[in-house]
Amino acid sequence: MSNKVLAGRYELFERVGEGGMSVVYKAKDKLLNRFVAIKILKPEFINDHKFIDSFRRESQAAASLSHPNIVNIYDVGREGNIHYIVMELIQGKTLSDYIKEQGPMPYPKVIALSKQIAAALAFAHKNHIIHRDVKPHNVMITPNGTAKITDFGIAKAVNAATIVDNTEGIIGSVHYFSPEQARGGYVDEKSDIYSLGIVMYEMLTGRVPFDGDNPVNIALMHINGEMIPPSKLVDGVPPALEHIILKCTDKYPVNRFASADELIEALNNLEFVSTVEGDSVLVNGKNRDE
């Protein structure tokens, strides 16, 4: 695929990533003289016309989102059997890779990244777009520490049967499913808040709360399983931060934060003091329900 030119405009270079549905290439937009990322659907999806229509529709809707914490979509196109999305090229690594390399993060870093991800979700939700697949693999971290979410709306194009696909990307999504997603039920912004809570848990502890040998077992754990509090796995977890994570991941949507903005407010209400050694220590947290 390298050196191919799409639409007479996008010259493909090296492969830079791969997910359950697609392969991502670095490319050059010869018209605007800039580098971009191009996500190309894998061949096994191109004959599902209902999926393709939904994929294009959701991608075009997501292209309307312009926010500092969202990866911009520039173009959606097709050339023969190649269906593609042209996106902002981000220098950095996925949050998934960051966690694998660094392990559990200091809680000030968890809070800073969580606020950025929540800000992206809040903006999308106000524009009536639900992500449905918030997970570390879909969050890019730039060298200056900015979090940028990708793949907005794409998960809506994937039917429920794909969770049993044998690709790592789609199976990986089950670790972040809300209980209502696991049941195949109604999904709204509170489902994204649940998934972000799981991401926060993983950033803080270095592991997901529910794991198993197959996607069905993991999905059932989201519905019925009891989550081990982060403080049982990592020393020094501030109770106020743990409270926020557990509220995000409540089994019942009505008990979660009402919106991503409310979650941001709770994170902003966490108070820190500096120690003699120069470290930040969380001393208080005021949540709306307290």
PLM features: what roles do these ranges have?
Residues F13-G19, V24:
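Protein kinase glycine-rich loop
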Residues K42-S64:
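AlphaC helix of the eukaryotic protein kinase fold
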Residues H49, P143-Y186:
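Activation segment of protein kinases
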Residues V76:
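Activation-segment/catalytic-loop signature of the eukaryotic protein kinase fold
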Residues G80-T94, Y98:
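Conserved short submotifs of the Hanks-type protein kinase catalytic core
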Residues L113-S114:
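Activation segment signature within eukaryotic-like protein kinase domains
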Residues I117-I129:
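Protein kinase catalytic-loop region centered on the HRD/HxD motif
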Residues H175-S274:
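C-terminal lobe helix-coil module of Hanks-type protein kinase domains
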